[in-house]
Swiss-Prot record:
Main location: membrane
Full protein name: Semaphorin-6C
Cytoplasmic side: 657-960
The species this protein was found in: Rattus norvegicus
Bias (Basic and acidic residues) ranges: 922-935
Keywords: Cell membrane, Developmental protein, Differentiation, Disulfide bond, Glycoprotein, Membrane, Neurogenesis, Signal, Transmembrane, Transmembrane helix
Length: 960
């Protein structure tokens, strides 16, 4: 076996260096707590008015949240509901204190247009505070959008209706965002019934109305608007759209941020008249860095500015493409990074099928296109209408900038690839006792809410921590006529930090949750502090409490060591109490199940499960959240795997090499084993039974070279040797045998041996028949050389031969008589040629001619030293015409112990007076015992070349 390749160290080095060049993809964190809403009060849910038959059938049809002055406004189908958050804090259920009803008056015409009845209601899609006293609301109004003004406190209509075109979409499924800034309404939506004209529009103010370019894919291409923000001198719009710069990849969506100047007055009559002159857009890059960047391109939700590491940032939820591997990510973008991105280079497409490349600075006109007139680079121009035409034409053809806005931490704050897709985000940037902790609340499309600590904050590590996972969906209250998948999707999140609540909106209902569930820790201080919940703290007398609640300022945030070691951990739900020294593990559930003890030094629980009602149940694990979220470095893991593989391959290769060498050594020594019998000469058989002379001394080197082959075998030759030729003997199918007539045998003994493959036993007697009348293989024992007395004896088996060699044996009785009697009555053959050929009857199809065993005679030739090698080349056997053996003619050829066909002698049968040993072909060609044999001495038709042997006295031994 070849030795292990020398390239193994190189392969090991390659495997060790490969992980260094790759960045491991972040793993999904494991939630520390899993909860559901079992036992939650029914008053925490709101589905619509009790007397509303449509709401009872379809549900709420939630559209939008808006919080104003401790009042929560909920826009829905045909209604706007107002909830007093102060009353909710006092224990009242989720019941609106007032609401407005605005139904469509054009439902009949909507049905004529081919729309379904469920689509023809008035869905309130826009809800914007116009000032401190007025609320602007716009509805689809059966595909005829209309806007109205309402008083915030009274919810009574004020003024006349306005057209909602370009302010509100026609269809409830189309996206829209709107914001009021400096007395004007900035909206982004579809401006026509077919949603083919996407528009960013300004109206209802002292400034002239402006819009984006119509039907220009460079400006907007099938956008889905998500959020609008006023910041500084600009209004920002966040959306996703079908990419124009990567159109060769198909319909790939990119996340964008676009901005316009609030003081923009439009262009001149020659260019961009009544259109934006400051419209620019950038790509938002939310991706996992590495050799091949993995992008989360589809923006789903965005928050307002939140403090992150001392800087104002926006938090967004991004997902992968719809036809890609499902995955979600949370990325934060600093506002100053977004502003800096709008100072980047412009991008253009020089040819129709060409790539988008940055525009060189020498081709950009001055002042910089997109600048606000009167400030900055365009300070010399008091109005955008005074800008040069080349600037206006350039900004019309180059609204896209390069490069993309990077995330705040250069990578996502959280990535999820094995869970449901995230759809909504809400951020509390002032959590914790010192109001400096950021907590993310994330909604998904399967109805779960995640409470997450982002990395770098209180998580004390580079990995995020999922503090809690809550299943907030209730099929009984929120299903309606929608599909189960659509009904479970969370489409809105609203934080009430003062009331310590989170409002979760589904298409059919809304529900509110507490931001924390500190009471579940009971009287276990270790569990309370190890939960890492920024809303929970330990009170000396009240246990684990909410730090925002009554007495929340008098809490112990670090814990007393003596209290943690000797205090009791009590389950608040069941009242069971653990002994001293028990860990923070509390079995939250009914029943007297014992608690799981652990080391007192470990104060960090792991994943647990609980419910929000009286029936709580869960398990916590004995790991800190920080250490639990950290995994083994991927490079180290791959290096260990590669080293283990290389070590195992080396050891296994060494073992296999040793085993092969040992097998070759055994094969060369030809060890006799019961499972692998080999052909034996008669001399060997005689010696095994105590007969025959002692073996001659080992020959000299010169004589050993002349030693011929003693026998052949079916054993495979060693490497480098020629395979046995008996394995490929011709068959009757491949070598047809024709009847031979009037052939005459050669007079020489060696030619008689060459033609002996067609010899028969004699005239008038079927070949292959024994004395008993059945076919049996024959054994012909060659007489001893001249000068040695011998005796012709015929036996039926090798056993009889061995018994004869030991001495005189009594005659057989029964079914095994000696075969000497039939031979005495056999008439002698008149010609040698009559006994040299067999009939032309073919052999059986599945029969391979057996081997021939020749007994070497004693002579002056050197005896082989030891046993002959199994791989000695075998004599070539055939069924064709005669050939001379490659032996000298001046001496008799060496005897060979070879297997021959049972039907008669082979072409290498000896001449007259030469006795051969024929053995039947063993089953399977190897490894089987020899069959019954018959020892015969054929009558010599011609005098032999040497002196004929004389009969030996009975009982004497053969000399071989």
């Amino acid at each position: 076996m070849p030795r292990a390749p020398h390239s193994m160290p190189l392969l090991l080095l390659l495997l060790l260096s490969l992980p260094q060049a790759q960045t491991a993809f972040p793993q999904d964190p494991i939630p520390l707590l899993t909860s559901d809403l079992q036992g939650t009060s029914p008053s925490s849910w709101f589905r619509g008015l009790e007397d509303d038959a449509v709401a009872a059938e379809l549900g709420l049809d939630f559209q939008r949240f808006l919080t104003l002055n401790r009042t929560l406004l909920v826009a829905a189908r045909d209604h706007v509901f107002s909830f007093d958050l102060q009353a909710q804090e006092e224990g009242e259920g989720l019941v609106p204190n007032k609401f407005l009803t605005w139904r469509s008056q054009d439902m009949e015409n909507c049905a004529v247009r081919g729309k379904l009845t469920d689509e023809c209601y008035n869905y309130i899609r826009v809800l914007v505070p116009w000032d401190s006293q007025t609320l602007l609301a716009c509805g689809t109004n059966s595909f005829s959008p209309v806007c109205r003004s309402y008083g915030i406190t009274s919810l009574q209509q004020e003024g006349e209706e306005l057209s909602g075109q370009a302010r509100c979409p026609f269809d409830a499924t189309q996206s829209t965002v709107a914001i009021s800034a400096e007395g004007s309404l900035y909206s982004a939506t579809a401006a026509d019934f077919q949603a083919s004209d996407a528009v960013v529009y300004r109206s209802l103010g002292p400034q002239p109305p402006l819009r984006s370019a119509k039907y220009d894919s460079k400006w907007l291409r099938e956008p889905h608007f998500v959020y609008a923000l006023e910041h500084g001198d600009h209004v920002y719009f966040f959306f996703r759209e079908v990419s124009v710069e990567d159109a060769r990849l198909g319909r790939v969506q990119f996340s964008r941020v676009a901005r316009v100047c609030k003081r923009d007055m439009g262009g001149s009559p020659r260019a961009l008249d009544r259109h934006w002159t400051s419209f620019l857009k950038l790509r938002l890059n939310c991706s996992v860095p590495g050799d091949s960047t993995f992008y989360f391109d589809v923006l789903q939700s965005l928050t307002g500015p939140v403090n992150l590491h001392g800087r104002s940032a926006l938090f967004g939820v991004f997902t992968t493409q719809t036809n890609s591997i499902p995955g979600s990510a949370v990325c934060a973008f600093y506002l100053d990074d977004i502003e800096r991105g709008f100072e980047g280079k412009f991008k253009e497409q020089r040819s129709l099928d060409g790539a988008w490349t940055p525009v060189s600075e020498d081709k950009v006109p001055s002042p910089r296109p997109g600048s606000c007139a009167g400030v900055g680079a365009a300070a010399l121009f008091s109005s955008s209408q005074d800008l040069p035409d080349d600037v206006l034409l350039f900004i019309k053809a180059h609204p896209l900038l390069d490069p993309a806005v990077p995330p705040a931490t250069h990578q996502p704050l959280l990535t999820l690839t094995s869970r449901a897709l995230l759809t909504q985000v809400a951020v509390d940037g002032m959590a914790g006792p010192h109001r400096n902790t950021t907590v993310l609340f994330l909604g998904s499309n399967d109805g779960t809410v995640l409470k997450v600590l982002p990395p770098g904050g209180q998580s004390l590590g580079p990995e995020p921590i999922i503090l809690e996972e809550i299943d907030a969906y209730s099929h009984a209250r929120c299903s309606g006529k929608r599909s189960p998948r659509a009904a479970r999707r969370i489409i809105g999140l609203e934080l009430d930090t003062e009331g310590h609540r989170l409002f979760v909106a589904f298409p059919g209902c809304i529900v509110y949750l507490s931001l924390s569930r500190c009471a579940r820790h009971g009287a276990c201080q270790r569990s309370c502090l190890a939960s890492l919940d920024p809303y929970c703290g330990w009170h000396r007398f009240r246990g684990c409490v909410n730090i925002r609640g009554p007495g929340g300022t008098d809490v112990d945030l670090t814990g007393n060591q003596e209290s943690m070691e000797h205090g009791d951990c009590q389950d608040g739900a069941t009242g069971s109490q653990s002994g001293p020294g028990d860990s923070a593990y509390v079995l939250l559930g009914p029943g007297p199940s014992p608690e799981t003890p652990s080391s007192p030094s470990d104060a960090h629980p792991g994943p647990q499960s609980s419910t929000l009602g009286a029936h709580t149940q869960g398990v916590r694990r004995d790991l800190s959240p920080a250490s639990a979220s950290r995994s083994i470095p991927i490079p180290l893991l791959l290096a260990c795997v590669a080293a283990a593989f290389a070590l195992g391959a080396s050891v296994s290769g060494l073992l296999v090499s040793c085993a092969c060498r040992r097998a070759n050594r055994r094969r060369s020594k030809d060890i006799e084993t019961p499972g692998l019998p080999r052909p034996l000469s008669l001399r060997s058989l005689a010696r095994l039974h105590g007969g025959g002379p002692e073996p001659p001394p080992p020959p000299k080197d010169g004589d050993a070279a002349q030693t011929p082959q003693l026998y052949t075998t079916f054993l495979p030759p060693p490497e480098g040797g020629s395979p046995p030729e008996l394995a490929c003997l011709p068959t009757p199918e491949t070598t047809p045998e024709l009847p031979v007539k009037h052939l005459r045998a050669s007079g020489g003994p060696w030619e008689w041996n060459q033609n002996g493959n067609n010899a028969s036993e004699g005239p008038g007697r079927p070949r292959g028949c024994s004395a008993a009348g059945g076919p049996a293989p024959r054994v012909l024992v060659r007489p001893p050389p001249p000068g040695c007395p011998g005796q012709e004896v015929e036996v039926t088996t090798l056993e009889e031969l061995l018994r004869y060699l030991h001495g005189p044996q009594p005659p057989r009785k029964g079914s095994e008589p000696l075969a000497s009697a039939p031979f005495t009555s056999r008439p002698p053959a008149s010609e040698p040629g009559a006994a040299l050929f067999v009939d032309s009857s073919p052999m059986p199809r599945d029969c391979v001619p057996p081997l021939r065993l020749d007994v070497p005679p004693d002579g002056k030739r050197a005896a082989p030293s030891g046993r002959p090698a199994l791989s000695a080349p075998a004599p070539r056997l055939g069924v064709s015409g005669s050939r001379r053996l490659p032996f000298p003619t001046h001496r008799a050829p060496p005897g060979l112990l070879t297997r021959v066909p049972s039907g008669g002698p082979s072409r290498y049968s000896g001449g007259p007076g030469r006795h051969l040993l024929y053995l039947g072909r063993p089953d399977g060609h190897r490894g089987r015992s020899l069959k019954r044999v018959d020892v015969k001495s054929p009558l010599s038709p011609k005098p032999p070349l040497a002196t004929p042997p004389q009969p030996a006295p009975h009982g004497s031994h053969f000399n071989f």
